[in-house]
């Protein structure tokens, strides 16, 4: 059956499975901050204007991150890029966490670094996912590009739902008072904690599967040359 074929492809394409797991955490960390952005800016920082600035930073930063990744990955590889940008994002989140929600310059500076890193990591994940297409074809004899793309879309929708539930839980369980301009300190601290440390921790979890990811650029190039040979599955790997 079609489902059995898909499970077989998944089981034989370990790099794809690792990338999908990493993609889940990347999306969750990014969406968690995005969904909480309004509450964080309005209540922790006291003005919706901060959200406007942060959205502009996100728009520019994501593009800059993608461009930096495109250049840097040619020199140090995609996997190392992911480690680098995840580390930088963690550092920037730690700086914002310990600085608190009182210094706008720190907020904008750390958000700029984090957004550039998120942009680079997301492009990195997508690029590595595309590499698994040839790997899967080499392993199974089937080029399942459509299945990989549809699975990624399904994962994105699921993560959106989970992130929405998580933010709703944070708002509901911390004592948030609707329509109050001033929230209790524990609510503000919870928003700050989730916005900084929790989102950074999730990005770190996204890196863990990459420790087991063995499909390097060199190996991918070899497979691109070999999987069309008469006996592609006789090649070790």
Question: What positions do the PLM features span?
Answer:
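Membrane-embedded alpha-helical bundles of multi-pass transporters/translocases
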Residues: 2-6, 10-224
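Single conserved hydrophobic/aromatic residue that forms the stacking wall/gate
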Residues: 1-9, 230-237
């Amino acid at each position: 059956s079609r489902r059995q074929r898909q499970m077989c492809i998944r089981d034989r394409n370990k790099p794809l499975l690792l990338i999908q797991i990493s993609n889940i955490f990347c999306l969750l960390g990014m969406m968690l901050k995005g969904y909480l952005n309004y509450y964080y800016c309005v209540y922790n920082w006291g003005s919706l204007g901060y959200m406007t600035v942060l959205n502009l930073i996100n728009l520019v930063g994501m593009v800059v991150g993608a461009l930096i990744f495109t250049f840097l990955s040619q020199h140090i590889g995609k996997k190392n890029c992911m480690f680098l940008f995840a580390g930088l994002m963690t550092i920037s989140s730690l700086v914002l966490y310990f600085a608190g929600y009182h210094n706008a310059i720190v907020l904008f500076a750390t958000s700029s670094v984090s957004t550039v890193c998120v942009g680079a990591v997301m492009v990195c994940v997508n690029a590595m996912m595309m590499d698994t297409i040839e790997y899967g074809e080499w392993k199974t004899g089937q080029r399942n590009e459509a299945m990989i793309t549809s699975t990624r879309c399904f994962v994105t929708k699921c993560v959106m739902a989970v992130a929405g539930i998580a933010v709703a839980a944070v708002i509901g369980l911390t004592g948030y008072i609707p329509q109050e301009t001033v929230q209790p300190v524990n609510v503000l601290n919870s928003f700050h904690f989730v916005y900084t440390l929790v989102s950074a921790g999730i990005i770190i979890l996204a890196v863990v599967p990459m420790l087991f990811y063995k499909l390097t650029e060199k190996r991918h190039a070899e497979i691109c040359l070999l999987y069309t040979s008469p006996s592609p599955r006789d090649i070790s790997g």
